[in-house]
Amino acid sequence: MPFLDIQKKLGISLDRHFMFLSAEQPYKNAARCHAFEKEWIECAHGIGGTRAKKECKIEFDDFEECLLRYKTMRRMHDIKKQREKLMKEGKYTPPPHHSGREEPRP
Protein backbone atom coordinates (compact mmCIF):
# COMPACT_ATOMS: atom_id res chain seq x y z
CA MET A 1 0.00 0.00 0.00
CA PRO A 2 1.58 3.27 -1.05
CA PHE A 3 1.92 6.04 1.49
CA LEU A 4 0.23 8.54 -0.82
CA ASP A 5 -2.36 7.00 -3.14
CA ILE A 6 -2.63 9.56 -5.93
CA GLN A 7 -4.85 7.42 -8.14
CA LYS A 8 -7.46 7.10 -5.40
CA LYS A 9 -7.37 10.83 -4.62
CA LEU A 10 -7.86 11.74 -8.28
CA GLY A 11 -10.55 9.10 -8.73
CA ILE A 12 -8.82 7.26 -11.54
CA SER A 13 -7.72 3.66 -11.82
CA LEU A 14 -4.93 3.06 -14.31
CA ASP A 15 -4.36 -0.47 -13.04
CA ARG A 16 -7.91 -1.55 -13.85
CA HIS A 17 -7.30 -1.10 -17.58
CA PHE A 18 -4.20 -3.29 -17.51
CA MET A 19 -5.83 -6.16 -15.63
CA PHE A 20 -8.44 -7.49 -18.03
CA LEU A 21 -8.88 -6.77 -21.70
CA SER A 22 -12.45 -7.90 -21.33
CA ALA A 23 -13.28 -5.10 -18.89
CA GLU A 24 -16.03 -2.78 -20.01
CA GLN A 25 -14.87 -0.90 -23.08
CA PRO A 26 -15.80 2.71 -23.87
CA TYR A 27 -17.66 1.95 -27.13
CA LYS A 28 -18.84 -1.54 -26.14
CA ASN A 29 -16.46 -3.19 -28.64
CA ALA A 30 -14.97 -6.40 -27.30
CA ALA A 31 -11.21 -6.66 -27.26
CA ARG A 32 -9.51 -8.82 -29.89
CA CYS A 33 -8.76 -11.64 -27.45
CA HIS A 34 -11.87 -11.28 -25.31
CA ALA A 35 -13.11 -14.84 -25.88
CA PHE A 36 -9.76 -16.44 -25.05
CA GLU A 37 -9.32 -14.30 -21.95
CA LYS A 38 -12.83 -15.15 -20.78
CA GLU A 39 -12.20 -18.90 -21.18
CA TRP A 40 -8.93 -18.62 -19.25
CA ILE A 41 -10.47 -16.57 -16.42
CA GLU A 42 -13.46 -18.91 -16.13
CA CYS A 43 -11.11 -21.91 -15.97
CA ALA A 44 -8.75 -20.36 -13.42
CA HIS A 45 -11.40 -18.73 -11.24
CA GLY A 46 -11.47 -20.12 -7.73
CA ILE A 47 -8.87 -22.89 -8.08
CA GLY A 48 -5.73 -20.97 -7.10
CA GLY A 49 -2.65 -19.97 -9.02
CA THR A 50 -0.73 -23.23 -8.72
CA ARG A 51 -3.57 -25.45 -9.94
CA ALA A 52 -4.57 -22.92 -12.59
CA LYS A 53 -1.10 -23.03 -14.16
CA LYS A 54 -1.44 -26.78 -14.64
CA GLU A 55 -5.15 -27.21 -15.36
CA CYS A 56 -5.70 -24.10 -17.49
CA LYS A 57 -2.50 -24.23 -19.55
CA ILE A 58 -4.36 -24.82 -22.83
CA GLU A 59 -6.64 -21.81 -22.28
CA PHE A 60 -3.70 -19.62 -21.25
CA ASP A 61 -1.65 -20.69 -24.28
CA ASP A 62 -4.55 -19.79 -26.58
CA PHE A 63 -4.89 -16.40 -24.89
CA GLU A 64 -1.14 -15.77 -25.09
CA GLU A 65 -1.05 -16.69 -28.80
CA CYS A 66 -3.92 -14.30 -29.45
CA LEU A 67 -2.09 -11.47 -27.68
CA LEU A 68 1.45 -12.04 -28.94
CA ARG A 69 0.83 -13.88 -32.22
CA TYR A 70 4.23 -15.59 -32.06
CA LYS A 71 3.07 -18.71 -33.96
CA THR A 72 1.50 -16.55 -36.66
CA MET A 73 4.66 -14.47 -37.02
CA ARG A 74 6.81 -17.60 -37.19
CA ARG A 75 4.54 -19.03 -39.90
CA MET A 76 4.65 -15.78 -41.91
CA HIS A 77 8.45 -15.77 -41.64
CA ASP A 78 8.63 -19.37 -42.92
CA ILE A 79 6.32 -18.53 -45.85
CA LYS A 80 8.46 -15.52 -46.76
CA LYS A 81 11.65 -17.59 -46.63
CA GLN A 82 10.08 -20.28 -48.84
CA ARG A 83 8.91 -17.66 -51.34
CA GLU A 84 12.39 -16.11 -51.51
CA LYS A 85 13.94 -19.56 -51.97
CA LEU A 86 11.57 -20.36 -54.85
CA MET A 87 12.27 -16.97 -56.44
CA LYS A 88 16.04 -17.64 -56.36
CA GLU A 89 15.50 -21.06 -57.97
CA GLY A 90 13.30 -19.47 -60.65
CA LYS A 91 10.26 -21.56 -59.78
CA TYR A 92 8.11 -18.64 -58.65
CA THR A 93 7.50 -15.23 -60.13
CA PRO A 94 5.49 -12.86 -57.96
CA PRO A 95 2.56 -11.04 -59.57
CA PRO A 96 3.31 -7.47 -60.70
CA HIS A 97 1.26 -5.88 -57.92
CA HIS A 98 3.48 -7.62 -55.31
CA SER A 99 6.67 -6.16 -56.74
CA GLY A 100 5.48 -2.55 -56.97
CA ARG A 101 4.76 -2.65 -60.72
CA GLU A 102 1.01 -2.44 -60.78
CA GLU A 103 -1.20 -1.22 -63.57
CA PRO A 104 -1.79 2.54 -63.74
CA ARG A 105 -5.13 3.59 -62.38
CA PRO A 106 -7.50 5.77 -64.42
UniProtKB/Swiss-Prot annotation:
This is NADH dehydrogenase [ubiquinone] iron-sulfur protein 5. Signal peptide: none annotated. Belongs to the complex I NDUFS5 subunit family. Its main location: mitochondrion. One of its GO terms (biological process) is proton motive force-driven mitochondrial ATP synthesis. It comes from Mus musculus. It is a peripheral membrane protein. Keywords: Disulfide bond, Electron transport, Membrane, Mitochondrion, Mitochondrion inner membrane, Respiratory chain, Transport. Residues 30-74 form the CHCH domain. Accessory subunit of the mitochondrial membrane respiratory chain NADH dehydrogenase (Complex I), that is believed not to be involved in catalysis. Complex I functions in the transfer of electrons from NADH to the respiratory chain. The immediate electron acceptor for the enzyme is believed to be ubiquinone. A motif (Cx9C motif 2) lies at residues 56-66. It is found in: Mitochondrion inner membrane; Mitochondrion intermembrane space. Disulfide bonds join C33-C66, C43-C56. A motif (Cx9C motif 1) lies at residues 33-43. It holds the Pfam family Ndufs5. One of its GO terms (cellular component) is mitochondrion. The gene is Ndufs5.
